[in-house]
Amino acid sequence: MKNKIIFGVLVSVGALALLSSCSSIPKNAKPVANFDVNRYLGTWYEIARFDYRFEKDLDNAIAQYSLNADGNVDVLNSGYNFKKEKWVSAKGLAKFRGDKKTAALKVSFFGPFYAGYNVIALDEDYRYALVAGKNLDYLWILSREKSIPEDIKNKYLKIAQEVGYNTSKLIWVKQDKNSPFENEK
């Protein structure tokens, strides 16, 4: 009986941790309002990111988003592993955490496990985006082109710093190859 109670408590704590991890956003960050997912779809080049094990040793990283029949967003991430000298890709699924006009989503590449994906800055033409994860360990700067203007870069770095990110830890992603996965969905 005691083991069943302990097991029940552990399952409950695990479920709470999982739920909170997929719905959180850094304290000082706010997802973009009046978000239009249709304008966000398509190819985004990764300009900068923190060092994550899922993207370790990747250059030329891109993310491609397309709307599926359920109204959720199919994700195809790809990049060139410069140590293994080969292209890699991962397919995922993004879902809105609430109102579809708010850029607060959760994304999964591993079955039922989701992580926060929050667009916290976006230019009016949907060319540049600043994306926060669930906490201050996850941050991306994205662009529709392989580079980003210096003024946009500085603006997004300032926003990230105001949220609490240590932007000195950003990795600036090399974009010098064309992905064989580009425009593949």
Regions found by a protein language model. Give the residues of each.
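A beta-rich soluble binding module of mature secreted/lumenal proteins
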Residues: 2-185
